[in-house]
Amino acid sequence: MSSEFSGSRLRLYALCGVIAPVFFTVMVIVEGFLVTGYSHMTQQMSDLGAYSLYGSYALLQNLNFFVSGILMIMFAFGLRRGLPGSRVIATSLGLFGFMFFLLGVFPDEPIPWPAAAHYLISWVGGVSLLVSVFFAWRRFRRPVAGEGVGWIMYGRFSLVILVLMVVSFVVLAIFGQPGSPIRGLVQRVSETPFLVWIEVMALGLLRLSKV
C-alpha cells in the first residue's frame, strides 16, 4: 500500500466494493417484488429499467445502475492505489463500473435503438470485467516480494471465477434468448460469479487497509 494513501481512505474505497454487489442484488430483488407482473424467472434484470414498461418504477433500477457503477469505479481506484502492479486490473474494473453506470443512461427499452445501445454496453462491460479477472489471476498466482502468500488464494479464486464467467457467457447465449422460460434465472446465475468476485476482492482490499 502506498505510504501516501492512508488506511482510512483505502478502507473507504474497499467498502465501496463490498457494498456494490450487495446493494445491486438487494435492489433488483426488491424492485422485482414491487413491480406488478414482473418475473425473476423469465425476465432480465434490465427489463426493470424500461420506463415504457414500468413507468416511474424503472427509475429505481436505473438509479441502481448509477449507484452501483459509481461504487465499482471508486473500488477500482482504491485497488489501483492499494495494490502495486494492479493497473490493468483496476483500469478494466473501472471501465466495467463506467459501463454499469451507462446501463442506466441507456435503459433496455423494447424499441431497437436504446436496446441495441444497452446490449452493446453490456458486452463491453462483460469483456472488460473478463480482462480484469484474467489479470487478477496473473497478478496473484505467485507470491510477490513483500506481500507474503496471502494473495495467492485470490489468484486461484480469480482463475475459478474466470472459468465460471466463460461458461456462464456460453450458457447465457444458449439458454438466455428472448422467449426462454428461464431467461431471467439464467441471467442471474450467469452474473453471480462476477458479483462474488468483486465482493471477495473488496474484502481482500479491506483486510489490507487494516494492516
Name each model-derived stretch.
Residues 138-211:
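Terminal transmembrane helical module of multi-pass membrane proteins
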Residues 26-27, 33-36, 40, 98-112, ...:
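C-terminal ends of transmembrane alpha-helices
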